[in-house]
């Protein structure tokens, strides 16, 4: 962290930067000052898809690890997003991981009473086939949100990121995410010394991506992992 890095915490000493923190993400967010975060990532553990699709294999086989994670209902997700809206800087970005169920059924109500605007989306091709009653799941979706005022110039500095991203990942967590994609997005939307936030860190891929981006500062937590 360089000398110009902004102090973002209301109370210092509760959380460590550039490392794992085992803590409730809402507690972490409540200790962060308004308009201090350049870029945030949010990957909720969706209860909705398990309730609606009812594959019948909850707690069985490869689904055990996923279902053992703390689930988030819609009200919890909305609370997180409102807090993220509060701490993100004007024209800063929130990268929201979303599954096909919520992409198709709708998620814009989560953004009500915020200053967050949908500006783009990336499809992550995971390179392997998952579950599905009809088509088999092979991708996830990253909704790109920008806090008002919306602008690209000066706020998005890389122009080599395609809207379909191929990257296989090592399964170190039920919600493992592509480190290189996240690294590129961090480089595109932050300057040296700025903060990258992930309040539901899971396998801490955003931490790894931030460290690889260099000269950025990670702050994040997970309720189960730290």
Predicted regions mapped to residue ranges:
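Core catalytic lobe of class I
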Residues: 1-221, 225
